[in-house]
Amino acid sequence: MDDYTREMMDLKTLVTRTLEKKGVLAKIRAELRASVFEAIEEEDRVIENNEGPPPALLGSCNDRARKLHASPSGRLLSALICEYLDWAQLNHTLIVYQPESNLPKDSWKSELRDFNSNNGFELNRNGDSGPLLLDVLEGFLKFESMTQGMGSSSRRDSETESSSSLESRNPPRRSSASDSLPPQRRPVSASQASDRRAGLSTSGYRKDEFNWRQGNQDTHEEVTRASAALENLQLDRKTRNLTSSWRNVRDGTNEEEGRD
């Protein structure tokens, strides 16, 4: 290979890469395919006018797609796709898509006019707005989000109602551990505690009479009366002890005087 051929190949590679980076080559390819499809369509129309057979040259989609395109939902889907291609100015792709899908040329415009008139969409909108396919997709996603939110809230409400009904049927019960705990006592002073310990040995008072609960005014009054009774009892015992000891001392003195 001589130098001239090598330079031409390098130049061809450089031009091809530059065109691919700028998107020019892809546009040329799409335009070429669109031109080929247009030429074939024109030939099909000539044959149809002369002989009358239906054009079926570019029916390359499968049977499921043909059935879908024949249904109202399928026609709307194809119209939304064509409207997006037109919005994105992918004209060559649109030229290829319609005949390859067995769709009449510009049939999507009439389909969208019917859809817009039935649903209140604006067909002639500004270029800044998105395609109708985007609006349909956003509406579907918003509807799904609202449905899920309503479903979760209804589940929470049902769970709350079931839990409240269970609580109403089964009121809370005290645990066995709390039942085994001793009753709470009100704090008392040191003198009252000593008097209480001293009075435990008496026969007139028992331990159960000193179970106090906090916040009960009647119990506090009972504690006061019991403390006063204990003090009186202790005073009586001390008085009797002093009297008996004084009598013993007196009797001993009398005996000594009698001996003398």
Swiss-Prot record:
Record-linked InterPro entries: LisH
Localization terms from the record: Cytoplasm; Cytoplasm, Cytoskeleton
GO cellular component, one term: cytosol
Knockout or disruption consequences: Extreme defects in morphogenesis, positioning of mitotic division planes and cellular organization due to dysfunction of the cortical cytoskeleton and absence of the preprophase band of microtubules. In the ton1 insertional mutant, the two highly similar genes in tandem, TON1A and TON1B are simultaneously disrupted.
Compositional bias segments (type: Basic and acidic residues): 248-260
Keywords: Cytoplasm, Cytoskeleton
PANTHER family: FGFR1 ONCOGENE PARTNER/LISH DOMAIN-CONTAINING PROTEIN (PTHR15431), PROTEIN TONNEAU 1A (PTHR15431:SF23)
Identification of the protein by name: Protein TONNEAU 1a
